[in-house]
């Protein structure tokens, strides 16, 4: 929520970022430690968002936004590309053996769903913000499906935690 005043160095928006959504929707929250760290933090946020197909919040504050410090432009060729790994063909067969695209099929490690560029012939599917059935992508209000999706979202965040280095705290 905007107060008309940027967040100061206390990062008072942390709890809002962590819990300020409807229902149980955990997601990764990152924060830059300095002005020079903003680039790396934004890059990491993008990597996580694409790899795990989950929203990521990156926190900043007035101190970082208005601060300045020397920053060496990185060698862009040394940065590992972020591959969206778009689906380009059907990923399963229906009960008759016909190849179909199931957007709810998940990577077993990241739990990321298959994602096709909207409008790709043969890979059409429903997208939007309403919760979908864990298996069919049809909109679902079923309580057991909702519980499964809540656990899936939490498992994604847990996988992100396991994928990043431990936080180094400086005294």
Where do the PLM segments sit?
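Acidic, glycine-rich active-site loops and adjacent beta-strand->loop/helix elements
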Residues: 1-2, 34-36, 62-65
